[in-house]
């Protein structure tokens, strides 16, 4: 019997290399050298009479997103914790979050001693289902965290309305959506606070890093204190050689600051973000058409989305394809055909082994609290069903050309056609 699939030692669809990520911006190397020679490598270093890279990035990123304030931070996780604490979330409060997301969307809530309430998702967008959010609200609910997942913008019209109706802050987790827009506004600017990750894989990256944006001067000031050991920037510049942070005693914080090297890289990477996003979008739109012709359902976005950002490309397999096969068998076969990783979706948070609050003694705050933060108590049927049917891949593959999209489609067609080999 002839062998066709590469995973069974057949000939792969493609052996050529794929685009790599990160791709350094044209000015990144010079920017790093300027910081290296500046005598100031952190915001806690001595003021040298010129604007720090961190303040420059904060100014540029706020302007890019059309908001008044940006507070850079060490990571997306740190940014989300700043947002939660600045909005007053604390011990025992409930925070509604999606059941399908990266683990930090829930672990940060536990990290401020609050209780994540995981709710199901919209099957088309894979983002928070507004009806499920409304049904989950209780007198203990303190905030709603909405994640713009993979390449979709969540239904911000409905979610903002739900939050406003119940007097709750809406926190947008935009770790995967830099530059995406809802009704002409950048994501992150619709909620009370928007948070971002600049980790290695993100479309805007400095290796590690994060930021929180807001139009509220009060929330911004709280986040400044929370990320810099209770210190904030002064109203006037200090004398050269003095530290450009002042101790106010307003709010105890911790060190979650971005370094000057990371900030300098982000200033340059931001200049190229829109161009890269446009290329990803063009290629993804072509791939959407090619895969839909084969019966796959590419991830949709909500009404009101005016611009998508593709961090991860996701598509649902046809209902009658690969019945009885684990999704990992399918993704491994596609990976062998293409030479880059095709992966399942995230595991739903109520079954995700990375989200295990009971493994940390610091969260053992009494039997009742431990029951409330146990993720196994949630029932998320849409998350469970879809994660058995979704294939995903990283945005780097979308930085190529149309021939690359045809290769991906050809690999999917080949594995669909010869799926019997996966059962042998």
From Swiss-Prot:
Function as written in the Swiss-Prot or TrEMBL entry: Catalyzes the PLP-dependent transamination of 2-deoxy-scyllo-inosose (2-DOI) to form 2-deoxy-scyllo-inosamine (2-DOIA) using L-glutamine as the amino donor. Also catalyzes the transamination of 3-amino-2,3-dideoxy-scyllo-inosose (keto-2-DOIA) into 2-deoxystreptamine (2-DOS).
InterPro entries with a match to the protein in the record: DegT/StrS_aminotransferase, PyrdxlP-dep_Trfase, PyrdxlP-dep_Trfase_major, PyrdxlP-dep_Trfase_small
Name of protein: L-glutamine:2-deoxy-scyllo-inosose aminotransferase
N6-(pyridoxal phosphate)lysine found at: 202
CDD domains given in the database record: AHBA_syn
Functional pathway: Metabolic intermediate biosynthesis; 2-deoxystreptamine biosynthesis; 2-deoxystreptamine from D-glucose 6-phosphate: step 2/4; Antibiotic biosynthesis; tobramycin biosynthesis
Keyword annotations from UniProtKB, A to Z: Aminotransferase, Antibiotic biosynthesis, Pyridoxal phosphate, Transferase
EC top class named in words: transferase
Organism field: Streptoalloteichus tenebrarius (strain ATCC 17920 / DSM 40477 / JCM 4838 / CBS 697.72 / NBRC 16177 / NCIMB 11028 / NRRL B-12390 / A12253. 1 / ISP 5477) (Streptomyces tenebrarius)
Recorded catalytic activity of this chain's protein: 2-deoxy-L-scyllo-inosose + L-glutamine = 2-deoxy-scyllo-inosamine + 2-oxoglutaramate; 3-amino-2,3-dideoxy-scyllo-inosose + L-glutamine = 2-deoxystreptamine + 2-oxoglutaramate
Cofactor: pyridoxal 5'-phosphate
Gene: tbmB
EC numbers, comma separated: 2.6.1.100, 2.6.1.101
Gene3D superfamilies listed in its UniProt record: Aspartate Aminotransferase, domain 1 (3.90.1150.10), Type I PLP-dependent aspartate aminotransferase-like (Major domain) (3.40.640.10)
GO molecular function: pyridoxal phosphate binding; transaminase activity
PANTHER family assigned: DTDP-4-AMINO-4,6-DIDEOXYGALACTOSE TRANSAMINASE, TRANSAMINASE
One Pfam family, short name: DegT_DnrJ_EryC1
Family as reported in the entry's similarity comment: Belongs to the DegT/DnrJ/EryC1 family. L-glutamine:2-deoxy-scyllo-inosose/scyllo-inosose aminotransferase subfamily.
